[in-house]
Amino acid sequence: MVLSMEIRQLIVAYARSKGDICALAQVSRDFQVVAERFLYSTLDLSGTDATISVCNVLASQPRVAAYVEILTIAVRDEETAGEEELSPHLPEEYWRSMGAGLRSTHRLMRLTIQVDYIGHSHHAWVLDRCQFKLRTFHCDLAWDDHLVGFLNDQDELEDLYILDFPYPVDAEHPTSTEPQRPLSPPPPPVRRVVSPVPRAGSLPKLSILECPTTDAVSALVPGRPITRVKTCFATSDIETKRRELTALFVNLRLSARPLLSLDLGDSSYNTDCTLNFLRHCVSANRTMDNVRYLGTLALPVDGREVWILPSHCFFFAYLIIMF
């Protein structure tokens, strides 16, 4: 008796454990296809050894790799606390196997790489020569030419989360506060760090962006249909934050779609910052006309500022949540 595909899928779906599904995969070739698709369509890999093992399977068995649509790779400090003293870096085999596995997953749609581990920076080369077209990509890899080159090829990407973006260093705002000797020669000028950015026309479907600084917003928002932005100030200095805020709204105006959500993190939440933020929102009314969410705000509870707040909120006709 030959079971239909629908019945085989129901049997696999009601299996109690992955061990039972593995056993079903050995019953017949028909069950093998359904069971393997169920096992490998969504993979959540945590730990060095497990990641190496599964990625080696994907690299050596293209048939299995073709089932993978959602992949999460994570290694955290607490998982490797006992090994950290002996090896401060993840082994090269970890990165090689990850790269080989990723290059074999041609149907991948959602990828998350969270390697919260010392020495993880500058390993975005694992994304080189990958052929999949993602819808969602979350990573904490270092922002470099490899990561930017990968993003340049992601024509279907809609949701992007990055944890790293180089902080600019400007000669007009030196970080050193040490006094200079009167007769010492002036220090050489500090050159601004130029970060690689995706080329114009890339990421044509990007609509959700979560990034660590407003500088990343200026690199990724203009010309793209971004409707939801989550970012934060790069500094706690009030004057610098004002300049950042002005530049942020200039870049938000350059989005190809109306903004629906803006969440701006601040290391020092206070009412002055909130009111300044709302003033910028009001002055950028065309950009903010359709906004429904403004993140976490420190609202005034007494004084004259309480009466100023309604006049600002009046302009947000569609605002749903504001705490």
Go through each PLM region and give its residues.
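Leucine-rich repeat
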Residues: 1-323
